[in-house]
Amino acid sequence: MVNTGRLGFVKLGAGIKEDRMAFSYMPGFGNDFETETLPGSLPQGRNSPQRPAYGLYAEQLSGSPFTAPRGTNERSWLYRIRPSVKHTGRFKAASYPLWKTAPNVGDHELALGQYRWNPVPMPKEPTDFIQGMRSITTAGDVLGQTGMAAHVYVANRSMVDDHFFNADGELLVVPQVGALRFVTEMGVIELRPGEIAVLPRGLVFKAELVDKDVRGYVCENYGAKLTLPDRGPIGANCLANPRDFKTPCAWFEEKETPCRLIVKWCGNFHVTEIGHSPLDVVAWHGNYAPYKYDLATFSPVGAILFDHPDPSIFTVLTAPSGEEGTANIDFVIFPPRWLVAEDTFRPPWYHRNIMSEFMGLIHGQYDAKEEGFVPGGISLHNLMLAHGPDAPGFEKASRADLKPVKLDNTMAFMFETRFPQMLTRYGAELETRQDNYIDCWADLKKRFNGTPEGDWS
C-alpha cells in the first residue's frame, strides 16, 4: 500500500515497493500548519486525546521554552506510531572527527589572515551526509547556545537505515552540486542547488541522494532560531516573502527493520540501535517544522541613483542575539540584479567589519572578484580583517562605462556572525586552500599624487 503526496506514506512489506515520486508542501513562514496522511489521524479541538485515532501516540516537540512570548513560541504536536522514547535504546559513543563544535580554539598553527579555498574534493570512499560533514569554522559556544559553525558537506551515498538529529542547533543547508532528499519525521524535502532548507534542532531525518555526488554548505546555528528580518522602511514586500517558503506535508514510513539513530549533543556524537524506522509521524500540527526556500524568489532592492548600499539589504534569514540589531547569524545572498547607480564604484567596497564573514559561491561569478573565487569555493574574512575587490576588479569597475548592467547567472552567499569564526584544523590544512589569496590585492596602486584628479595612468 503506497500513496505519496499530501496523504503520503510508505508501508514496506512483501511485494510492496517504495514510491517517492512526488511530495507536497504547504506555503508560508512560521505558520501554524496542520497535515495528516490518513483521514482523521489528526485530532481536532484538542492536542492529546485519551485514545488517538489509529492507535497513535501524541507527542509534543518544543523548539522554545513553554513560557516564550507568543511571537517566538514554537512547538508542534506529532501523532506517531511509536513515541520517541521507543526510538532510542542504550547509547554508545560515535565518532565523526571532522565535524567540530564551538568552542574549538587553537587546534592548528596557521597564522591569522584572509583565507580562500577551491572546492572541497568529492570523497572516493562511500560517504553519507553525516560522514561527509567537514567543519571549516566554529564561533561562539554551543553550551551557551550562541554562535554557529560553518561546514561543507560531500557525499556519494544515501543514509538508508541511519537517522540523525542535532540537539546542538538547527541546520541551514545550501546545496552546490547535486540534489538531495531530506526524509524527516515531519515530511520530505526535495532540495536542489539554488534552494535552501532549514532542519530544526531535534528533528529526526535521513539524507538520500538524488544525484550520484553531492556537495554544499551548512550553517549550524547554536542560537535563536532563524527568522525573517524586519524590512523597516522597505515596507511590506520584497526580500524573502513568507509565501515562498515551503513546509512539507506529513509523510511516514512503517518499516520494521534494524535502524540506527545518531545524535549530536553538546559537540559529541552518540548512536543507538532500534528495530524500526523512527520516521513514523502520521499527522502533525504546529509551527516548529522544517522548510525549504527557492533563492530565485528573493526580490532584491538596491540603489537606484548612486552609491552601493550595505549588504544587509540582501538578508534572507537572520538569527537574532540578545543585542538588538546585532545578529547571531545573518544568511545573506548576492543574487542576479541590475546595477544602475551613477558615478559610483559598483562592486562591494573595501571594508573592515565587526562581523565575521564566511562566503560561498553556488554558481556563476561574484562581482568583487574577477578570478580565484569559483563555484564550490569558500572565503573567510574574519572580524576586523580588511577585504574587498581584487586589483583586476577594482581596475575594471573604476573605468567601466556606467550603463545599466545586469548581473546574471550568479549566486553567492554569506554566513555572517557577530563572533570571530575560528578556523578548524581541517580548514587550515585543506589542500585546496589558496596560499596566494592575499596576492589578489598586491597590484592595487597608489593613486594619490596631491592633485584632485589623482593618478589614473
From Swiss-Prot:
The keyword Ribonucleoprotein does not apply. It catalyses: homogentisate + O2 = 4-maleylacetoacetate + H(+). Pathway: Amino-acid degradation; L-phenylalanine degradation; acetoacetate and fumarate from L-phenylalanine: step 4/6. The keyword Kinase does not apply. Gene3D superfamilies: Jelly Rolls (2.60.120.10). GO terms for molecular function: homogentisate 1,2-dioxygenase activity; iron ion binding. CDD domains: cupin_HGO_N. Its EC number is 1.13.11.5. Coiled coil: none annotated. Its cofactor is Fe cation. It is an enzyme of class 1 (oxidoreductase). InterPro entries: HgmA_C, HgmA_N, Homogentis_dOase, Homogentis_dOase_bac, RmlC-like_jellyroll, RmlC_Cupin_sf. One of its GO terms (cellular component) is cytoplasm. GO terms for biological process: L-phenylalanine catabolic process; tyrosine catabolic process. It comes from the Bacteria. Homogentisate binds at residues 366, 387. It holds the Pfam family HgmA_C. Fe cation binds at residues 351, 357, 387. Keywords: Dioxygenase, Iron, Metal-binding, Oxidoreductase, Phenylalanine catabolism, Tyrosine catabolism. Hexamer; dimer of trimers. Belongs to the homogentisate dioxygenase family. Involved in the catabolism of homogentisate (2,5-dihydroxyphenylacetate or 2,5-OH-PhAc), a central intermediate in the degradation of phenylalanine and tyrosine. Catalyzes the oxidative ring cleavage of the aromatic ring of homogentisate to yield maleylacetoacetate. PANTHER family: HOMOGENTISATE 1,2-DIOXYGENASE. NCBIfam families: hmgA. HAMAP family: Homogentis_dioxygen. This is Homogentisate 1,2-dioxygenase. It comes from Mesorhizobium japonicum (strain LMG 29417 / CECT 9101 / MAFF 303099).
